[in-house]
Amino acid sequence: MAFAPVGPEASFFEVLDQHRASLLAALRRGGGEPADGGTRLASRFEDSVGLQMVPHCTRRKIKSDSPKSVKNFALILKILSIIYKLVQSNTHATKRDIYYTDSQLFGNQTVVDNIINDISCMLKVPRMSLHISSTSKGLIAGNLRYIEEDGTKVHCTCGTTAVAVPSNIQGIRNIITDAKFLLIVEKDATFQRLLDDNFCNRMSPCIMVTGKGVPDLNTRLLVKKLWDTFHIPVFTLVDADPHGIEIMCIYKYGSMAMSFEAHNLTVPAIRWLGLLPSDIKRLNIPRDTLIPLTKRDQMKLDSVLKRPYVTCQPFWRKEMEIMADSKMKAEIQALTFLSSDYLSRVYLPNKLKFGGWI
């Protein structure tokens, strides 16, 4: 069904219609992007899925009779016993709850997180199936309604107040939206600024999501669920820096750490809307508003350029090479040099209207 022009000019929706049609055609071919060969690593890259664990990959062994493995073995058994009780009693606990059951034994939260991921991978089940949840940090706003697992009706709006991403994405039902696109915003500050500038109403109907930086599992699950349910165009708005690009890649292609859950988390159809490094020159953004790449930034950029999915994204590679050559990065806030509401009033509407994504 084609989108009816409401609010913004008809051409805006025509562009989205064309993009949506191409996405659906790609889906019928079996993926979110044109088919291309993947690279076999410990995690394999496939265009239609992202980074996923290869069958029969290298395994980590923990032996109960090995002095080096005693503590890890004990930690795994401890968490497995907690999971068993949770499943048996049909109750749930957060990762933080599990950490505080014996904080001295675990040492820190990261240890718990990694073991839970290992158990989920070992049993080949999503983390929610282990009855382990985590507090969502993401936010959502725009044209969206749904019912949570406990029956709570949630009605997101296009106003200045966002709704927290649900902690149990699998449990939400009766999802309703008329949105023409989904915009993923890297940073909370940018997300809030767009809400304050009435962007959602101006470009209505749409949905906006932010993971407040590196997205948590629930935010990624929500984006995936919205894509699977509605197949509307999904765009990302990130800083023109290596960190922002990596966050965008996590949404689109996933991460090595969660490659065993790639089918539930990745959205390869995601497009990069902005801020593009090429936009910096095109918009004549002054050099004194830019930030030099640090050595760490350059290492991160080199790392991303070597990843297998970059080979099937020549336009992304070109943008990253522009950044590498200039040795400069820019935050989205650099656009305020042009005007305080340039992002919401000019930049994003024009990008969406004229298909300025890659």
Name each model feature, range by range:
Residues 1-233, 242-358:
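Nucleic-acid enzyme cleavage-core boundary/entry regions
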